[in-house]
């Protein structure tokens, strides 16, 4: 079995491609079932965020498994595989393990060290378990990645002062208008990203904020989190009226198609309007920029803001790298030790069978008058002897770091004791 990751990210693909390959949580069960239906895919987990879609898998044959995952991605994005391939990356074995740990630690994020990705890795692990995508290898790997992500944030300073996508979006708005306090601001959507937008806007002095949401309940739930802020609440049918009055509009919804485009905006009485779309799939169609006075920015435009933050964080990232290597090594040692399990189990089973047979012979010779408590003593004695004899060889076998040396030992045990073993994971 081999571990692979195939995917794309903000480093390899523009948002116009990433939005085509975004998998909503409601569709994750179908995606995992589809991937598991391929003949060479044994385990699977999916991380889907605004900046990445990554398929982690345990495959029987690396080349065939990777080909099947690429086919799935092409079908999901409704793209020709030849066109899609230039945006994909593939990592195998140790590199795939290291990549997941780097993702969980925030080292692969657009915003170096951002904390939201760890929650997204946890969610991917939970969904993988829930939809029966995970087996022994990926379950352990994701748990190790989550542990590594927590360690990086608690044992290094990489998370200190890190900007998020939401805070970067607010920084971008401030760069464009200087003073947010005199701007009419609208946020379309009332999810977690919108909550963070409100938080950062208020901290930057914004006073006139309107929340537009599909459901009144969602908007009210968001407003309750900011009891000291006078948030205006509107429902989706009022969206265009709100946009017409706004100076800056942030969009952050789960819509799979654009909710704003040129056709909807061109007849509005707009003077100047800044649209900042932090959703993937995109909420705002690119053709709105054909309207005079409208400026559109999507998540890829945030790199301008992030660049100011990155240089000071590089040194912190180096500290995190060393810590992650420890976690990678721990996982690899565990994975390699699985190779010994069938042989050890077979040896213990064979020795235990011999012990039981010989004990039964001895007790039958001693006769029925032999007291039960004495039988228990002999039972305990023989088990103890077996455990003592097997303990050191098993410990040494598991601890052997040299792969070839370990395989020679395994083959020797199998030959000397005539063991029948099942194939290891």
Curated annotation (Swiss-Prot):
InterPro entries: 4pyrrol_synth_GluRdtase, 4pyrrol_synth_GluRdtase_dimer, 4pyrrol_synth_GluRdtase_N, GluRdtase_CS, GluRdtase_dimer_dom_sf, GluRdtase_N_sf, NAD(P)-bd_dom_sf, Shikm_DH/Glu-tRNA_Rdtase. The record marks 99 as: Important for activity. The active site is at 50 (nucleophile). Pathway: Porphyrin-containing compound metabolism; protoporphyrin-IX biosynthesis; 5-aminolevulinate from L-glutamyl-tRNA(Glu): step 1/2; Porphyrin-containing compound metabolism; chlorophyll biosynthesis. Its EC number is 1.2.1.70. Keywords: Chlorophyll biosynthesis, NADP, Oxidoreductase, Porphyrin biosynthesis. PROSITE patterns: GLUTR. Disulfide bonds: none annotated. GO terms for molecular function: glutamyl-tRNA reductase activity; NADP binding. It catalyses: (S)-4-amino-5-oxopentanoate + tRNA(Glu) + NADP(+) = L-glutamyl-tRNA(Glu) + NADPH + H(+). The keyword Isomerase does not apply. SUPFAM superfamilies: Glutamyl tRNA-reductase catalytic, N-terminal domain (SSF69742), Glutamyl tRNA-reductase dimerization domain (SSF69075), NAD(P)-binding Rossmann-fold domains (SSF51735). The keyword Oxidoreductase applies. One of its GO terms (biological process) is protoporphyrinogen IX biosynthetic process. Substrate binds at residues 49-52, 109, 114-116, 120. NADP(+) binds at residues 189-194. Possesses an unusual extended V-shaped dimeric structure with each monomer consisting of three distinct domains arranged along a curved 'spinal' alpha-helix. The N-terminal catalytic domain specifically recognizes the glutamate moiety of the substrate. The second domain is the NADPH-binding domain, and the third C-terminal domain is responsible for dimerization. Belongs to the glutamyl-tRNA reductase family. Homodimer. During catalysis, the active site Cys acts as a nucleophile attacking the alpha-carbonyl group of tRNA-bound glutamate with the formation of a thioester intermediate between enzyme and glutamate, and the concomitant release of tRNA(Glu). The thioester intermediate is finally reduced by direct hydride transfer from NADPH, to form the product GSA. Catalyzes the NADPH-dependent reduction of glutamyl-tRNA(Glu) to glutamate 1-semialdehyde (GSA). This is Glutamyl-tRNA reductase. It comes from Picosynechococcus sp. (strain ATCC 27264 / PCC 7002 / PR-6). The gene is hemA.
